Structures are given as structure tokens and as C-alpha cells.
Regions:
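Surface-exposed patches in mature extracellular/periplasmic domains of secreted proteins
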Residues: 7-13, 53-55, 124, 128
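Immediate post-signal peptide segment of exported/extracytoplasmic ligand-binding proteins
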Residues: 2-24
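Short helix-initiation/N-cap motifs at beta->coil->alpha
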Residues: 53-63
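Detector for C-terminal structural segments
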Residues: 31-42, 61-184
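Short alpha-helix C-terminal cap/hinge motif
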Residues: 40-51
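Short, well-ordered beta-strand elements
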Residues: 19-29, 51-54, 71-72
């Protein structure tokens, strides 16, 4: 596809000029990431793509990503608001090297994002969201492929716990009920 084919018969695709095509993916040296890497390697190899994983500690990978030194890196995210504007900032050109780790720059998207920040909730804002999301999907600087689910278990004496819809900070809203006398 587009000249990225196996030209020398070694089983791996090459760049259109015939030089080796090797994907370099940053990762962390832990069991969960090793399992995800093996799954990704299996699927990349199935389509003839050679992928090499470079493990480093998470802060080192973040520093390299902000400096624009990584080709690929898998990171997770958590919703921060009801409408997803904070997630769309990852595609905003002026945020390159901060929230926009892919350093994606597209003037059409940037204009939509800037318009979005000044609009109140309503049909016009929703239409701008739709257009921005379409550009993000079409250019795909981020490949979203995993949705994590969280299951909560709670001790009976915990009072006031309710998982927030956004963010992960719930600990300041709980208390432990005093135990009745005679209960150990």
C-alpha cells in the first residue's frame, strides 16, 4: 500500500525507496506493558511491519515525548469533563510538546478548537465538536484502541463514596462511620 511493500523478500515491508521500515515504540519495563507489546508485535508482524520496543521508565518516556523524540508511545487518559474539549486539546497545534504529545499541527483543526473554546453549550458548539472530531479521526495522530473499565469494591463502614464521572479524585468526599460499641 502506497509503496510500503516487501521488496527484498525478507517478510518485512520497506519504505518506498527500499530502505527498511522499522517502527520504534517506547514502552515501560513492566509486566502489563510487556503483554500489550507482545500483542501489538503479533499483529504488526501479521501485516509485515517490524516493530522494536524501547523500554524506559515512564518519566523518561514523557520527557522524550514532550521533546518530540518518540515515534510511538502508548499512554492512557481519563475524561476531564462532560464534552471532551480537554481531550481535543491533544490535537491543538499550540499545545505541541505539552498536552499534544504527537505534535500534531493542522490549521483547520486549530481554528475549530479556538472557536470551540468561546462557544456556550448548544447546537453550534456541537457542530464544531463534530467537525473537530472528524478531522482528528481522519488525520489520526493518536490511535485510540483501549477503553478501561474500573470496578469498585467498598467496605461497609465507608460513608459518602460515589465514583465521580470525571477525574479520579474521590477520597476527599468519604468518611468512615464510627463503629457501634461492642463491635470489633
Amino acid at each position: 500500500m502506497y509503496g510500503y511493500v516487501d521488496k527484498n523478500g525478507d517478510g518485512w515491508r520497506e519504505l518506498p525507496d527500499g530502505s527498511p521500515l522499522v517502527l520504534m515504540s517506547a514502552t515501560q519495563p513492566d509486566q502489563r506493558n510487556r503483554q500489550l507489546n507482545e500483542l501489538l508485535r503479533k499483529h504488526m508482524n501479521a501485516i509485515g511491519l517490524n516493530i522494536v520496543f524501547k523500554p524506559a521508565k515512564w518519566p523518561e518516556n514523557l520527557k522524550a515525548a514532550r521533546a518530540g523524540k518518540l515515534q510511538m508511545w502508548g499512554v492512557a487518559s481519563t475524561a476531564a469533563g462532560g464534552d471532551g474539549q480537554s481531550i481535543l486539546e491533544r490535537y491543538y497545534g499550540p499545545s505541541a510538546g505539552q498536552g499534544n504529545l504527537a505534535r500534531f499541527k493542522l490549521p483547520a483543526f486549530d481554528a475549530l478548537f479556538e472557536k470551540l473554546t468561546g462557544l456556550a453549550d448548544g447546537p453550534e458548539r456541537e457542530a464544531v465538536f463534530r467537525d473537530a472530531k472528524r478531522l482528528a479521526v481522519a488525520y489520526m495522530p493518536y490511535k485510540l484502541h483501549c477503553h478501561r473499565f474500573v470496578v469498585d469494591m467498598m467496605y461497609g463502614d465507608v460513608v459518602g463514596y460515589r465514583r465521580p464521572a470525571y477525574w479520579l479524585d474521590w477520597w476527599h468526599m468519604i468518611d468512615v462511620a464510627p463503629q457501634p460499641a461492642g463491635r470489633a
